[in-house]
């Protein structure tokens, strides 16, 4: 599992876009513990907590060297598959795909799809409740091979039903990149994010869904869009993100250990 830190390139998106994949690959090839042999073929498992979704395509490029195309299970209030000329169209030159404005927190899955990093017809959005610029948004999303589960669906299906839909669609052997935007959680519970949307899931509901999809073959994950400047004095957003990260990591370890995960030494989770 990748361990390390990466410097940010504020306002130099084109640099981050080109350099981050190499850094993640290099970090992922390191030995995961002192006696382990370093990997030679790339990043086997990659988990990050970046502040922005601009990091996601880099992780998918790094994982692509080991797994090829991966399915994406994307928890978010928003699609994030917009064509750059549509989101936001005001300052994008549609004739120049090398513009750094093509690479935003709402276009990164469009970028990843165009680079053939995402396994089509195996990828899922969950928790959606975004406003659309038009019906074309969903049509473009469908054309990229995504299935959508709306935030409201949890009222009818329950957390277990949402998890079952994801598992049934993706399967348990397909390599999966799990991407979690903190704005999946309702803005009243996790206000510290850049694009909050009311009417989201509770933290408990998201955690129940994540536990329900433990059977997925998760090879990479992120928890993104936490903005401490907008968090409350109780830091509820940061706490929620930390718990979500804990759930993801423990689920990955649990699957990796299999039966070996039983009977381990108990540890305290509080001082």
Language-model features, listed with the residues they occupy:
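Conserved alpha-helical scaffold segments that buttress catalytic/binding sites
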Residues: 1-271
């Amino acid at each position: 599992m990748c361990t390390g830190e990466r410097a940010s390139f504020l306002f130099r998106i084109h640099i981050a876009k080109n350099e981050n994949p190499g850094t993640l690959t290099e970090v992922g090839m390191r030995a995961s513990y002192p006696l382990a042999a370093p990997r030679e073929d790339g990043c086997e498992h990659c988990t990050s907590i970046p502040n922005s979704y601009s990091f996601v395509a880099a992780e998918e490029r790094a994982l692509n060297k080991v797994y090829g195309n991966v399915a994406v299970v994307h928890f978010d209030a928003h699609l994030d598959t917009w064509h750059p000329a549509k989101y936001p169209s005001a300052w994008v030159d549609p004739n120049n795909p090398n513009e750094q404005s093509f690479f935003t927190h709402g276009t990164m899955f469009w970028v990843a799809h165009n680079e053939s990093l995402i396994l089509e017809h195996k990828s899922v959005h969950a928790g959606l409740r975004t406003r659309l610029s038009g019906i074309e948004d969903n049509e473009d999303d469908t054309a990229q091979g995504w299935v959508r589960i709306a935030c409201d669906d949890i009222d009818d299906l329950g957390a277990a039903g949402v998890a079952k839909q994801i598992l049934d669609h993706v399967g348990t052997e397909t390599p999966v990149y799990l991407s979690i935007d903190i704005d999946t959680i309702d803005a009243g519970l996790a206000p510290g994010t850049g694009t909050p949307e009311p009417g989201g899931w509770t933290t408990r509901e998201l955690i129940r869904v994540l536990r329900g999809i433990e059977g997925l073959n998760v090879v990479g994950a992120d928890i993104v869009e936490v903005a401490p400047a907008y968090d409350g004095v109780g830091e509820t957003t940061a706490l929620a993100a930390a718990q979500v990260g804990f759930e993801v990591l423990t689920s990955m370890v649990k699957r990796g250990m299999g039966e070996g995960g039983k009977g381990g030494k108990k540890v305290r989770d509080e001082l």
